[in-house]
Every structure is written in C-alpha cells, then in structure tokens.
Regions:
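ATP-dependent adenylation/nucleotidyltransferase module used to activate substrates
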Residues: 1-141, 145, 149-152, 179-187
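Generic structural signal for well-ordered, non-membrane alpha-helical segments
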Residues: 5, 111, 201-204, 208, ...
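A short, amphipathic alpha-helical segment
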Residues: 13, 17, 46, 213-216, ...
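Alpha-helix boundary/capping and short turn/kink residues
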Residues: 21, 201, 216-220, 235
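Catalytic subdomain that performs nucleotidyl-dependent activation
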Residues: 57-58, 137-217
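Glycine-rich beta-alpha junction loops
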Residues: 65, 199, 230
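Short, basic, helix/turn surface patches
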Residues: 111-123, 159-165, 212, 216-231
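A short, charged, Gly/Pro-tolerant segment at domain boundaries
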Residues: 221-249
Length: 249
C-alpha cells in the first residue's frame, strides 16, 4: 500500500509545504465522510506522517448524519489497522434538514450543521487542525459556482483559520485531481460508504460538475486554465508562504 501511495502523497506534500499546512506538534483530525476523498486523504496523511520532518498527531472523525443504511464499520476497521484513533458521532442532522425544517436548499443547512458538529468534537479533543478532502476539481467547481450564481470571484482557501472555534482548516488535496483520486481509491480498495442523500445529484454543485465535465471533453485543459487563473489573481489566501506561484496539480 505504501508503494502505491508514494506518488500521491508527494502531491499532498507539495500543497502542505506550499501553504505551511502542518506545523510541529499539530493535532490533526481528518473529517471522514466515508467517501473516497476523505478516506484517501486519511491514508495519505498517515503515510506522510511516517517521514515528514514535522511531527503531528492524526485521528479521524465521522459525523453520521442519520441516513439509513450507512455503515461505517469498515472505516473503523481501516483506522484500527492503521492505528489511527477514530470517532463516529451520531447526529439527527438528516431529520432536522429534511423532516423538521423541510429545506428548499438542504445542502447549505446540512453543511452548516456538519461543520458545527465537527467543530464541537474537535474542541472537546484539543485538536487544532481539521483536514478536509476538497480537491482540485472541487476548487474549480466552487470558483465557477461563485462566478455563475453569485457574480463573485471566490473560492475556499487552502488554509482557513476559524476565529470562533480556534481551529484551522487545511485542504491538503487541492493539487490532486478527482480522476486520480477515484482510480487510486479503487486500486487500494478503500471501504467507501455510499451517500444515500437524495440531494447528492440534485444540487447546483452537481450541475456545475456536469457542465465542466462536458466542456472538458472538448477543451481538455479547461479546468487547469481556470485553476491557473485562480492562482494568478491570486484569490485571497492562495498566496504561497514564500510568495512563489503555486504549482498546481
């Protein structure tokens, strides 16, 4: 497994170094949804931990939303094999979003409640950094969502400090493309937990993903061009620690 992960972990390390995501003594939790992105991030950080010059602690936290049929037992078993502390917290987020509030835009409230539950769990454990599985394609999609639906040039930052919680969010996979992640997750036979959310393929983000994929079939470098434009502006928070141009995926 380590041999297969070497190249991918190198991509992760580039982002970590470019944005000084990891410092000596950090206590890092990976927000594990059960999807391929967060599971591969967990494996890559565990691999990086074995040789990175700065020591950091690593654990995994899952916020269980309350959908029937989601079994995180295989995720717990993977964490046991890797000797990574794992916490799975049950919540009623699904019930609140779909049954109580009956939201027209459920994704926004769900994300807000997930973040709140994660931040609470992190504070209780003395963790100072939360690693999220957003990748290269997520960044491009978020930028296009902001441009097309809000009229703004905006995207999440590689590193974000949250004043209210005192937690720093890091996104070590911003240089990793979704296709590479999907292929590697299959090769490693990661225990992916399928998401039964009815909005999983009915959101604006999914529409943008489909649009970008359609355009990329005709213009293969399109996503890289968009990502490069984000870097060259640069968007707030996308400056590297030494002022160099970020290296992209």
């Amino acid at each position: 497994m380590d041999k297969i992960l070497n190249e991918f972990t190198g991509v992760i390390r580039r982002a970590v170094d470019d944005y000084n995501m990891i410092e000596e003594g950090d206590k890092i939790a990976v927000g594990v949804s059960g999807g391929k992105d967060s599971l591969l991030l967990l494996l890559a950080l565990h691999h990086l931990q074995s040789y990175y010059p700065k020591h950091f602690d690593l654990e995994a936290i899952t916020i269980e939303l309350g959908f029937e049929g989601m079994d995180f037992t295989p995720v717990a078993e993977l964490c046991r094999e890797l000797d990574i502390p794992y916490t799975c917290l049950k919540t009623d987020i699904k019930e609140v979003v779909f049954d109580v509030r009956k939201e027209d835009n459920p994704c926004s409230l769900c994300a807000k409640m997930r973040r709140g539950a994660l931040n609470d769990a992190i504070r209780q454990r003395g963790i100072n950094k939360l690693a999220l599985g957003h990748h290269f394609d997520d960044a491009v999609e978020t930028f296009m969502l902001s441009l097309l639906f809000e009229g703004r040039l905006s995207c999440f930052r590689p590193v974000t400090y949250l004043d209210r919680s005192g937690v720093t969010q890091i996104r070590p996979m911003i240089y990793a493309g979704e296709l590479k992640i999907s292929n590697l997750a299959q090769e490693l036979q990661l225990p992916v937990v399928e998401n039964p959310c009815p909005q999983d393929k009915g959101s604006k983000r999914y529409e943008i993903k489909q649009l970008l994929n359609t355009m990329s079939a005709q213009y293969p470098d399109m996503k890289s061009k968009v990502f490069g434009a984000m870097q060259r502006m640069p968007l707030p928070g996308w400056e590297t620690v030494d002022g160099r141009m970020p290296r992209g995926k």
